[in-house]
């Protein structure tokens, strides 16, 4: 079984954590933007059936 040789420094741990958080932020921003475009009817990537 692989065992890490040395303890990861606090700064490296913080950098990795921030990268992980940033990915989540951008994903949520994209999802919000897509939801907004769907609700306003400006979406070019989805075909939404509108009931009249």
Curated annotation (Swiss-Prot):
Q: GO cellular component annotations, sorted alphabetically?
A: chloroplast; large ribosomal subunit
Task: Name one matching Pfam family.
Answer: Ribosomal_L32p
Which processes are annotated in GO (biological process)?
translation
Which InterPro entries does the record match to this protein?
A: Ribosomal_bL32, Ribosomal_bL32_plant/cyanobact, Ribosomal_zn-bd
The superkingdom listed in its UniProt entry is Eukaryota
- Chief subcellular location: plastid
- The answer to whether the entry has keyword Plastid is yes
Which cysteine pairs are covalently linked by disulfides here?
none
Subcellular location, record wording? Plastid, Chloroplast
Protein keywords: Chloroplast, Plastid, Ribonucleoprotein, Ribosomal protein
According to the UniProt entry, its GO molecular function terms are:
structural constituent of ribosome
Write out the similarity annotation. Belongs to the bacterial ribosomal protein bL32 family.
Q: Which HAMAP family match?
A: Ribosomal_bL32
State the protein's name. Answer: Large ribosomal subunit protein bL32c
Q: Which organism is it from?
A: Capsella bursa-pastoris (Shepherd's purse)
């Amino acid at each position: 079984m692989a065992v890490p040789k040395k303890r990861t420094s606090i700064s490296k741990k913080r950098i990795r954590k921030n990268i992980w958080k940033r990915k989540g932020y951008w994903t949520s921003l994209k999802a919000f933007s897509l939801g907004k475009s769907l609700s306003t009817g400006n979406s070019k990537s989805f075909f939404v059936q509108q009931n009249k």
